[in-house]
């Protein structure tokens, strides 16, 4: 293997949407950084059976729906 080509692998803290925290190893950020999740297994409809709404951060979903609202309409 070539030396010096792999990213630094270090410990970070992950904070889930309900406030639960855990430590894991990652190449994201720097050693000791905190990653705050917007969506996780406790809030994503794929794991909750669709009972939760996904938070539309920054209006991305709204812009997408507006842009493609008439895409499949017959006319």
Swiss-Prot record:
Could you name the domain of life of the organism this protein comes from?
Bacteria
State the GO CC annotations. ribonucleoprotein complex; ribosome
Tell me one GO molecular function of this protein.
rRNA binding
Pfam families found in the cross-reference section: Ribosomal_L31 (PF01197)
PROSITE patterns for the chain: RIBOSOMAL_L31
Keywords from UniProt, A to Z, are: Ribonucleoprotein, Ribosomal protein, RNA-binding, rRNA-binding
- The residues that cross the membrane are none
InterPro entries the record matches: Ribosomal_bL28/bL31-like_sf (IPR034704), Ribosomal_bL31 (IPR002150), Ribosomal_bL31_A (IPR027491), Ribosomal_bL31_sf (IPR042105)
One GO process term, biological-process aspect: translation
Similarity remark:
Belongs to the bacterial ribosomal protein bL31 family. Type A subfamily.
* HAMAP family listed in its UniProt record: Ribosomal_bL31_1 (MF_00501)
Q: How does it assemble?
A: Part of the 50S ribosomal subunit.
Functional summary from the UniProt entry:
Binds the 23S rRNA.
What is this protein identified as?
Large ribosomal subunit protein bL31
Supply the source organism for this entry. Nitrobacter winogradskyi (strain ATCC 25391 / DSM 10237 / CIP 104748 / NCIMB 11846 / Nb-255)
Encoding gene (name):
rpmE
């Amino acid at each position: 293997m070539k030396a010096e080509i792999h990213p630094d692998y270090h410990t970070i803290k992950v904070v889930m949407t309900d406030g639960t925290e855990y430590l894991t190893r990652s190449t994201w950020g720097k050693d000791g950084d905190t990653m705050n999740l917007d969506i996780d297994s406790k809030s994503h409809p794929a794991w909750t059976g669709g009972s939760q709404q996904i938070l539309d951060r920054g209006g991305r979903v709204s812009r997408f729906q507006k842009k493609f609202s008439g895409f499949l309409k017959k006319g």
